[in-house]
Amino acid sequence: MFRKVYLILFILSSLSLSCEKEKNSDPSFSLNLSGKKGGVPVRIDWIYKGFPGEMKIYELASQRPVQLWDTNTVSDLDLAPVSSLIEDSKLVLGPGETRKFALVYKNETKDKLYFFAAPHSVNPPEFGFGFKFKCLCVNHLFQVAPGAIWYRIVEIRTMPNWASDPFQITHTLVRVDPSQAKEWNNMGNHSHSDE
């Protein structure tokens, strides 16, 4: 009796493992984007861990020159170097393009907020090749005073022969307790934005 039960469990676990392997690895998969032309929709998404509100993306104001990674807070959105909201956080990118835009967050709480961004991920992952996103996941702790509007100038750069299907880039924004932020700030462990 025990032998039969053991045999059945062994067969079921073998089938389960082979099904799991098939789901995670397709040896016949080979990405081929030849013939793809034109603009590709790229959505910028966010996951929030204790972080209230939402991060939005904006076009840059042409009359206000900015540098990559400029980061600041302002009391009113009109004082930020931005123009229009990018609807659905969706950019359309082409080969060889350099696209700067602004990440914008309004702290509507009564507390100073500290946060960082975990490294971004691309979904589907096969479209993660051929571009560079100079963003906010640079091992840096950011802060926003109550009622303030925080912004950061970022950039996506595609290779001249870049081709893709639509995909999304997702960052996780993690709220940091003020005591932890103070400890990290005292340690002086910051990344440099040019890394």
Regions found by a protein language model. Give the residues of each.
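Short, solvent-exposed loop/turn segments enriched in Ser/Thr/Gly
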Residues: 27-28, 96-101, 150-152, 166-168
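Short beta-strand and strand-turn-strand segments in soluble, beta-rich domains
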Residues: 75-86, 124-139
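Terminal connector regions
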Residues: 111-134, 159-195
